[in-house]
Amino acid sequence: MRLVLSSLIVIAGLLSSQATAATAPEQTASADIRDSGFVYCVSGQVNTFNPQKASSGLIVDTLAAQLYDRLLDVDPYTYRLVPELAESWEVLDNGATYRFHLRRDVSFQKTAWFTPTRKLNADDVVFTFQRIFDRRHPWHNINGSSFPYFDSLQFADNVKSVRKLDNNTVEFRLTQPDASFLWHLATHYASVMSAEYAAQLSRKDRQELLDRQPVGTGPFQLSEYRAGQFIRLQRHDGFWRGKPLMPQVVVDLGSGGTGRLSKLLTGECDVLAWPAASQLTILRDDPRLRLTLRPGMNIAYLAFNTDKPPLNNPAVRHALALSINNQRLMQSIYYGTAETAASILPRASWAYDNDAKITEYNPQKSREQLKALGIENLTLHLWVPTSSQAWNPSPLKTAELIQADMAQVGVKVVIVPVEGRFQEARLMDMNHDLTLSGWATDSNDPDSFFRPLLSCAAINSQTNFAHWCNPEFDSVLRKALSSQQLASRIEAYEEAQNILEKELPILPLASSLRLQAYRYDIKGLVLSPFGNASFAGVSREKHEEVKKP
């Protein structure tokens, strides 16, 4: 699943001899971009250009919406399912069969490595999903057999078949009804690939390039990539929704923290994704900048490795949770841009349990409970991502605050910074004690939180960092999926939240607003509560430059 990328390499050198290398890497982000596009500054790593092969990261948070489309989308304002590649669909057999009718004039991108000869059809959808769920499919094991999001849902066990009824109709048959199925197909993990491109790679015996040299139907296509520096996206002129307004977008990967803010202030960046909450005053006071805030479908949490004593004891997990001053996290990390979490679900979720209780901060009680449990001289290793995330703008600072809190109750915490591109592989060796992580979903269905993060299947799919497996909990989740009645599902998810409150495999910390800052002349930028939004409608308004007072 992980790609090994050198530090100075364009997509041509990495994946193909056909693309053109940039000769001046120091100037690529801004040399010609103001006249023909914009610079989007974000912190993150690129492990793959196929969101199906990732559990999170830049491909899921930013790139998938530019490169690919899905059968369905979620409206960022109404939170309802809307058509995308499927112009209509039918739910049959009480939710065990789903039939999709595809749009007839959708073009794949023409790139340096592939020229399509036909439009999107049912073969592409069948190929995309058979590769994921059919373990005997010739493409299933290419670049590893892991499809983290779908593996956590046990997708391969639940999908009986996906078949082409005609050139523009596809039917999924499930082993049992699943009320969340459509919502999972609306995530960016369900991006549709080109079967024709896959066939070309098979003839060349270069199947591994499917996930590295992307070909999709989205508004932009990959033009150039320099690891740790930038990604250049070129407009897909044949995009089915109409030509994107700007010819190119540069995704700047080169700076973190205050470096990205400096680039925004000097005009080297046009858009700053996930600015630190501590920077809000600067952003609000500068007339050259605009700031957008929206509630987000995300959760930041602390995961306890329940495979390792003494963290395998729920009483120890509860005692440690009492030591954490969550109110201080709200003030020092989020600066009023988040609310303390009482559940794995954000409060915006329709299944949120209003009776859920925030874990109290009581260090004295924590010390007493740890002593009663015989816990002394405990040392825990806390693994932390190094870059800002949609759910946590300052993970390392958060870890330092947790470290100080636990020290007050006699627990030594050793912070282990982990770079994003290596985090999943290192976490799966199960040597960590605690993990500071989070989850953002582009689905409004609560199943998008529960199963990927805490189901038994999610352990092997590398998304269950607590390594917690509870058959009763899994049974409740299956009960929720078996009903098309909202009231029944809400009741089941309340039961699931009660189990989590009792067992505490993860400690919910915060549900944050989504933040995005941008230059005054950038128009049409959408900030979705689900994260990944298309850049197709973004433009630059030309007028006299605003000066800082």
UniProtKB/Swiss-Prot annotation:
Family of the protein in this entry: Belongs to the bacterial solute-binding protein 5 family.
GO CC annotations on file: ATP-binding cassette (ABC) transporter complex; outer membrane-bounded periplasmic space
Entry's localization field: Periplasm
Keywords recorded for this protein, A-Z: Peptide transport, Periplasm, Protein transport, Signal, Transport
Source organism per UniProt: Salmonella typhimurium (strain LT2 / SGSC1412 / ATCC 700720)
Xref: Pfam families: SBP_bac_5 (PF00496)
Effect of deleting the gene: More senstitive to protamine than wild-type cells, but not as sensitive as sapC, sapD or sapF deletions.
High-level lineage: Bacteria, Pseudomonadati, Pseudomonadota, Gammaproteobacteria, Enterobacterales
GO terms classed as biological process: peptide transport; protein transport
MF-aspect GO terms: peptide transmembrane transporter activity
Signal peptide: 1-21
Function according to Swiss-Prot or TrEMBL: Involved in a peptide intake transport system that plays a role in the resistance to antimicrobial peptides.
Protein name: Peptide transport periplasmic protein SapA
Swiss-Prot/TrEMBL induction comment: Part of the sapA-sapB-sapC-sapD-sapF operon, RNA detected in mid-log phase cells.
Database matches in PROSITE patterns: SBP_BACTERIAL_5
